[in-house]
Amino acid sequence: MAATRIEKDSMGPIEVPADQLWGAQTQRSLEHFRISQEKMPVALIHALALTKQAAASVNMDLGLLPQERGEAIIAAAKEVLEGKHPTEFPLAIWQTGSGTQSNMNMNEVLANRGSEILGGVRGSERLIHPNDDVNKSQSSNDVFPTAMHVAAVIALSEHLIPELKILQKTLADKAEAYKDIVKIGRTHLQDATPLTLGQEISGWAAMLTHNLKHIEDSIPHVCELALGGTAVGTGLNTHPEYAVRVAKKLAELTNHSFVTAPNKFEALATCDALVHSHGALKGLAASIMKIANDVRWLASGPRCGIGEISIPENEPGSSIMPGKVNPTQCEAVTMLCAQVMGNDVAINIGGASGNFELNVFRPMVINNFLQSVRLLADGMRSFNEHCAVGIEPNRDRITQLLNESLMLVTALNTHIGYDKAAEIAKKAHKEGLTLKQSAMKLGYLTEAEFDEWVRPEDMVGSLK
């Protein structure tokens, strides 16, 4: 039987594995919430450690925490950030909706490890108290939303936005490279008037430009931190300078523009900042799904589909059909976009379900948010590296389909009118004629007039 030690909390003593740094409240959570396999995200754990580091530093500066205890807490928090205690944070996402148990998990680990750093022991005889020292000037109700925002801003700024910019540039470069390749357009999955391949791809690049702005515009609200609001937003048990100072300290530690929330009641009672920001992520998912679907449709074939572009052939596509290659990057990214959209529904429900002074859907909200960021960042990187950079035009196929399109007849609208142009197109379709043959049979224009007026390369912009 594994060795244990006795830890105590306000509910009494409880056995805890002797080789673990966590304490009584973490152990109770482990025993009471054996639900699924999802654990609190590492990014959130690191954000909690950063929050404790900042709080200890400010509490020392304000004379509220003895120097040696504060320095030990900071040293222990740095160890967590360095990845030295990965097994000490075992709690499920599906716990108290305020994240209290994960806050106490961090408090207990830092208290026990800090005690060891000071030469003491872990357990009830430790030299640092998880509540009185590590959690000084704090409540789970302001710590956990603060850590959520810190984790979200870091994930967006350092992981997602760089990948989004790279993919946008790839598409913008492709748009420029293929700006002179005239192809047929399609609306309603039917033939439409011409455009260039560059123009089509430029639309994809512009979508991502807008997505980037929407995401960046959401970040300032997420940079507002609840820390200093304590239990219900009033700041009970905090120094008057604490809230501003601790936000400034977190900004220094992370190099991100964190500020104290101007209204702590909003910061505790809602998840509005993350609801709004994730809405921008959902918008990005919608754009990426559209782009990936367009790519795989345009690359369909190779002989019996549209086949206007080629994409990299990365791996065999079938266990029974030799030589088959599939648009697997497009399939992977559209699946993850669907997951992000599902995450958004759950986040919306969580955001709408806070009662009175505290939202209690927080662990689910931040888990879904961070999963969406990770999926989108990884998905864009994979799609860019293994698909987008390798998009190439199939010029012969593009020319073939362009010349077969009946919608080139639109160029005649300004010369013979809509009704006669429609008659030409319908006759050509019904009798299997070219547009020129149909127009000449109907006697609406000469061959020379047709050649002068129906020029696909002149149909990709406004009238000159």
From Swiss-Prot:
EC class (word): lyase
EC number(s) from the headed UniProt entry: 4.2.1.2
Catalytic residues as annotated in Swiss-Prot or TrEMBL: H188 (proton donor/acceptor), S318
GO biological process: fumarate metabolic process; malate metabolic process; tricarboxylic acid cycle
Main location: cytoplasm
Additional free-text comment from the UniProt record: There are 2 substrate-binding sites: the catalytic A site, and the non-catalytic B site that may play a role in the transfer of substrate or product between the active site and the solvent. Alternatively, the B site may bind allosteric effectors.
UniProt protein name: Fumarate hydratase class II
Source organism of the structure: Photorhabdus laumondii subsp. laumondii (strain DSM 15139 / CIP 105565 / TT01)
Biological classification of the source: Bacteria, Pseudomonadati, Pseudomonadota, Gammaproteobacteria, Enterobacterales
Designated gene of the protein: fumC
